[in-house]
């Protein structure tokens, strides 16, 4: 068999926030609350510009690696102490941090949403935007749904395949957009792309 080393260290959770790295004082200055993240709900007062002063009662120093305060905290109640420098208000909120992979998924959704907004703006609403994340069936179904659904009224579609993990979706995408089968791929005597 193949040797695989065991996991070492802690899994570091994430609060679902983007930070202002130009902030030089104590704490973490919030630049953005990522959509669908732990603080993105109606009861939270978390907004861009506030400072996270403490996590579970531990003060975040100016040069401190705050990540250690989130080790092994995914889906566990975590107390976050917040300060709003504009209103001078301090408060605490309890959240359930998410895993790094869950945060990466949120960042991907944010990236796609921002690209779609750019395309809509630059084309004056004439073009839609889809990103093909991977060359597999779930990604194809999402593209198909977007093209025939929310972008049905558009004059064209920007198809983005950057950072695509690869696969065998190219035939399906070509047929979707052209209506014609341009290739028959035969592997060991059987058509593999029907």
Language-model regions: role of each:
Residues 2, 6-8, 29-38, 58-194:
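Cleft-lining beta-strand/loop regions that shape enzyme active-site pockets
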Residues 15-20, 117-121:
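Short, surface-exposed beta-strand/loop micro-motifs that present aromatic residues
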Residues 18-34:
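PDZ/PDZ-like groove recognition
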Residues 47-53:
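Structural motif
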């Amino acid at each position: 068999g193949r040797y695989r080393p065991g996991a070492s260290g802690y899994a570091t959770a994430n609060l679902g926030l983007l930070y202002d790295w130009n902030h030089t004082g104590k704490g973490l200055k919030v630049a953005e609350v990522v959509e669908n993240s732990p603080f993105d709900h109606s009861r939270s007062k978390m907004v861009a510009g506030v400072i996270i002063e403490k996590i579970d009662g531990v003060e975040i120093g100016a040069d401190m690696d705050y990540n250690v305060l989130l080790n092994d905290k995914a889906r566990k109640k975590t107390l976050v102490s917040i300060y709003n420098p504009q209103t001078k208000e301090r408060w605490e909120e309890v959240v359930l941090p998410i895993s790094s992979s869950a945060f990466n998924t949120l960042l991907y959704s944010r990236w796609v949403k921002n690209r779609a907004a750019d395309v809509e703006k630059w084309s004056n609403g004439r073009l839609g935007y889809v990103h093909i994340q991977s060359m597999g069936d779930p990604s194809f179904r999402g593209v198909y749904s977007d093209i025939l659904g929310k972008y049905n009224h558009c004059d064209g579609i920007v198809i983005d395949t950057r950072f695509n993990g690869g696969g065998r979706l190219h035939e399906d995408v070509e047929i979707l957009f052209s209506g014609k089968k341009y290739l028959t791929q035969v592997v060991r005597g059987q058509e593999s792309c029907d």
